[in-house]
Amino acid sequence: MNNIWWQTKGQGNVHLVLLHGWGLNAEVWRCIDEELSSHFTLHLVDLPGFGRSRGFGALSLADMAEAVLRQAPDKAIWLGWSLGGLVASQIALTHPERVQALVTVASSPCFSARDEWPGIKPDVLAGFQQQLSDDFQRTVERFLALQTMGTETARQDARALKKTVLALPMPEVDVLNGGLEILKTVDLRLPLQNVSMPFLRLYGYLDGLVPRKVVPMLDKLWPHSESYIFAKAAHAPFISHPVEFHHLLVALKQRV
């Protein structure tokens, strides 16, 4: 069986599982893991095929969620950033008894633009898939630059993301393509109407991948959830605004 890379740290009485985004790995959380591990028992995970979780091919969202769940604590707050938000959401839908609270960060239940739904144009995602075969590293770097564009700390935030990618071997092209396929095709807008655990959605006002227009739309669709927008953040608010991010999670802990 292929193994998911998993690291546990901290002594908190609540478990917090952190799931990273497309093309990256768990090293992306190093900017906040020390602070969080003083409040939570923290679980850092490389998604299947990414980082140190080698030996996986492209997986569907459901298979990715099941692979991650195999090593997870019985009950935890599940936090997913970007693509990781879809994985955390899938776990909340299929195994709600394992999820104390769901937190999505700069994530959308439907990343791809649809009729009357803002998102990434499908041809942009298809273009990334094509370019992966042509110039793998440059395509990943372009995607990372998109994630920090517009913020006051854009350059240093992009450097932090690039350092995370380069710290470990690059994922296989089919794994990256599989991740883009999930972003292109998955739509969890209606299923997530039915989750009953605390549900916190965090966004960056300047995010170029998850338009802020989706926030009021999802407030209406999911009235049981809460949303918060980081006024000066883009797609990686935990890198640009770590203190604010940390406070929101500690406040959530008091409620679960």
Swiss-Prot record:
Q: Where in the cell is it found?
A: Cytoplasm
- Active site residues according to the UniProt entry: 82, 207, 235
Gene Ontology molecular function terms on file: pimelyl-[acyl-carrier protein] methyl ester esterase activity
> Which UniProt keyword terms apply here?
Biotin biosynthesis, Cytoplasm, Hydrolase, Serine esterase
Give the primary localization class. cytoplasm
Q: What is this protein called?
A: Pimeloyl-[acyl-carrier protein] methyl ester esterase
UniProt-listed PANTHER family: HYDROLASE ALPHA/BETA FOLD FAMILY, PIMELOYL-[ACYL-CARRIER PROTEIN] METHYL ESTER ESTERASE
Q: Which residues form the AB hydrolase-1 domain?
A: 15-242
Q: Which HAMAP family match?
A: Carboxylester
Enzyme class label? hydrolase
Enzyme Commission numbers on file: 3.1.1.85
Copy the pathway line from the protein's UniProt record: Cofactor biosynthesis; biotin biosynthesis
Biological process annotations from GO? biotin biosynthetic process
Q: Which residues are recorded as binding substrate?
A: 22, 82-83, 143-147, 235
Question: Which GO cellular component terms, listed alphabetically, does the Swiss-Prot or TrEMBL entry include?
Answer: cytoplasm
- Please name one Pfam family that this protein belongs to: Abhydrolase_1
Family of this protein: Belongs to the AB hydrolase superfamily. Carboxylesterase BioH family.
Its assembly, as annotated, is: Monomer.
